[in-house]
Structure formats: structure tokens, C-alpha cells
Design a protein with these regions (language model features):
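Extended, non-catalytic substrate-recognition/exosite surfaces adjacent to catalytic cores, especially
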Residues: 1-201, 210-211, 223-224, 236, ...
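Residues within well-ordered alpha-helical secondary structure of globular protein domains
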Residues: 30-34, 231, 252
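A broad detector of the eukaryotic-type serine/threonine protein kinase catalytic domain
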Residues: 160, 230-231, 255
């Protein structure tokens, strides 16, 4: 305020402007809840009766406990106990002692008695997601859902979470081809492209496949390959110029993520 005091956002009549569209935001929240809660039921059914769930069958208990330990050390409870001067032995005892707590479930909150350590394993069972919708013309964010439940899971999957970019990375390979003199009308045979394990430093030979066989053994243009997201075309470009050239171009364009220079980059396998 002009007099040096802080504004009260609730009582001082401030106006908050946002690009969020309330109708789209409502649809986004409802859509995420409907879809993820349905997937969660399928997930429960899949792992029912399996003692190590939701971890792979070949995981040893030491590996599972290590994951739980990591979750424990990243928790707010652990940080507060460390700040209070508790030893690791004392903290472990506290985390294994049952206390009253409230847990998240898609059917509503559950009031129960559980050890903090067991609650971490319980929470590890949930499928998470986030979504953001942006107007491509203005860049305005119209809907934003960071996770399945802010009260219980304060991790923002939109801003912080990492995910494979997939086919959205393919235009970078086409850009490289154009940069190197290829025309959008340049034709490429739509046949399997094999990356030899010895030449490319792989464990075994690798030949990426297309999602369908509608255009098998046809000559297709770069333009058509991009429009239809055909894997064998980006694999062909990758084999012509190599992964280092692709990474260099991505960095020049402005991608700041760590990108491994490997053949599978042609399918957008990095986070």
C-alpha cells in the first residue's frame, strides 16, 4: 500500500486477472478425475493379490524398501524431524509407529490409523496426472490441473513433472533434413530402417516400427511422413545424419533439457 503496509487479498478489493477460462477449467478437473479414477480401478484389479504391488515382480524387497526410504526422506514430516534434531534411529522409529491420519481415496478421504512409512507405500499406489490447455494463438493458459488432489499431493505434474516428448520431437528431425538440403517433396521408401548394434553402440539391432501398415513399402515424401507421424521416415533421417546432429540442432533452437544422442531419439524418447 502507499503507506507501506501489506495488502489483504481478501478485504482490500484487489482485482485478480487470469487467462483461465472457468468453464474449461471445470471440464479439465472433471475430465482428469473421471479418467484417472477409472484407470486406478483397473490398476487395482491388475495388482490384486500381489504382495509386492505396485512394483515389478522381479524387484527384490531391498529395492522396494529403498524406494520407500527415498519417499520418507523427501517428506515434510522427515524434514521437520531432522530440523528438530532427531537422529536417523529416532526418525525411523517414528515412521514405523502407527498414528491417526487422513488418507486420500477417489471415494473420499479415509480416517485411519497407520504408520507414516506404510502411508508412503499406500500413496505410491496411486496413478498421477496433470494437464494444461493453452491457446496456440495467444499463449494464454486456459486450464491448468497440476495433479489429482492438491491437499494430499502437492507435486505439480505440469510444471515439474517430466514426460517423454514422443512424436512432438519429430519436427526437429525434419528441420534437420530441410537444413541439409532435402526438399519437403523428397521421397523416402517406407521400409524398416535397421540400426546395427555394433555401429550404433546398442545391445542389439534396433528397427523402429510404424503404428500401422497402411503405407508399407510405398515411397512417401517428407511432407507426408511428417503429417502422418511415420516412424520409419524419422528413423531414415536419423540414420542419415546421426543423433549428434539432431541434438545440436535442438540445442540451437532452444531446447535446454538433457538429451542423450541415441538413435531412439527419432521417436522422442527423452524427457
Amino acid at each position: 500500500k502507499p503507506d507501506g503496509t501489506n495488502y489483504n487479498v481478501y478485504t482490500d478489493g484487489l482485482k485478480v486477472y487470469t487467462t483461465i477460462n472457468s468453464r474449461l477449467q471445470k471440464y479439465a478437473e472433471e475430465g482428469l478425475k473421471s479418467h484417472i479414477s477409472s484407470l486406478q480401478q483397473d490398476f487395482y484389479t491388475h495388482w490384486k493379490g500381489y504382495s509386492k504391488a505396485p512394483y515389478p515382480k522381479d524387484f527384490e524387497w531391498d529395492q522396494i524398501n529403498s524406494i520407500i526410504d527415498q519417499g520418507m526422506k523427501r517428506s515434510e514430516r522427515y524434514r521437520k524431524l531432522k530440523k528438530a534434531g532427531k537422529s536417523e534411529k529416532e526418525i525411523n522409529k517414528i515412521f514405523k509407529t502407527k498414528v491417526p491420519m487422513t488418507l486420500f481415496s477417489w471415494e473420499g478421504e479415509i480416517d485411519t490409523t497407520l504408520s507414516p512409512r506404510d502411508s508412503i507405500r499406500y500413496n505410491k499406489f496411486f496413478i498421477h496426472s496433470g494437464m494444461m490447455s493453452m491457446d496456440p494463438k495467444t499463449g494464454f493458459v486456459k486450464a491448468y490441473v497440476g495433479g489429482i488432489n492438491y491437499k494430499h499431493f502437492k507435486y505439480d505434474h505440469v510444471k515439474i513433472g517430466k514426460r517423454q516428448v514422443g512424436s512432438t520431437f519429430k519436427p526437429f528431425l525434419y528441420s534437420l533434413a530441410i537444413q541439409e538440403g532435402y526438399s519437403p517433396c523428397y521421397e523416402i521408401p517406407n521400409v524398416p530402417v535397421v540400426f546395427d548394434k555394433e555401429r550404433w553402440g546398442l545391445e542389439k539391432d534396433w528397427a523402429p516400427k510404424n503404428s500401422g501398415n497402411d503405407f508399407d513399402e510405398m515411397n512417401i515424401t517428407l511432407k507426408f511422413g511428417l503429417a502422418n507421424s511415420i516412424n520409419t521416415v524419422t528413423a531414415y533421417i536419423m540414420k542419415q545424419f546421426g543423433p549428434h546432429a539432431v541434438v545440436d540442432l535442438a540445442k540451437k533452437i532452444g531446447i535446454q533439457s538433457k538429451i542423450l544422442a541415441v538413435p531412439s531419439l527419432c521417436l522422442g524418447t527423452f524427457d
